[in-house]
UniProtKB/Swiss-Prot annotation:
Species the sequence originates in: Campylobacter jejuni subsp. jejuni serotype O:23/36 (strain 81-176)
Family label: Belongs to the bacterial ribosomal protein bL12 family.
Name of the encoding gene: rplL
InterPro entries named among the record's database cross-references: Ribosomal_bL12, Ribosomal_bL12_C, Ribosomal_bL12_C/ClpS-like, Ribosomal_bL12_oligo, Ribosomal_bL12_oligo_N_sf
Membrane listed as a keyword: no
GO biological process, one term: translation
Role noted for this protein: Forms part of the ribosomal stalk which helps the ribosome interact with GTP-bound translation factors. Is thus essential for accurate translation.
Top-level lineage group: Bacteria
Protein's name in the database: Large ribosomal subunit protein bL12
């Protein structure tokens, strides 16, 4: 029996955030690719060159507001950071709090997306 694209998509849609993150890392390693978004060129040439030279490669993920769905946000914080329940709860309730420091742009943007979908407010610094 052949596996269809729909079967693969159904399987992926049932993965937890942590399992999906691990799957993406395995794809990156196996196929030598990156899940980072493609940069689109634009703007003035002189301004673009200066921006490229100063573009950050490492970011701090700062939770500025836990939002209304704190339980969901706490679960995501635990999955992203590996913190225990009490530590994750404290991080969500005592904002602003730095969740991770010095992470790659793609990882920081993915974490921000997950947290914002759960109702939290996040800054990348």
């Amino acid at each position: 029996m052949a596996i269809s694209k729909e079967d693969v998509l159904e399987y992926i849609s049932n993965l937890s955030v942590l399992e999906l993150s691990e799957l993406v890392k395995e794809f990156e390693e196996k196929f030598g690719v990156s899940a980072a978004p493609v940069m689109v060129a634009g703007g003035a040439a002189a301004g673009g060159a200066a921006a490229a030279a100063e573009e950050k490669t490492e970011f701090d993920i700062v939770l500025t507001d836990g939002g209304a769905k704190k339980i969901e946000v706490i679960k995501i914080v635990r999955a992203l950071t590996g913190l225990g329940l009490k530590e994750a709860k404290d991080a969500v309730e005592q904002t602003p709090s730095t969740l991770k420091e010095g992470v790659a742009k793609a990882e920081a943007e993915e974490a921000k997306k997950q947290l914002e979908e759960a109702g939290a407010k996040v800054e990348l610094k």
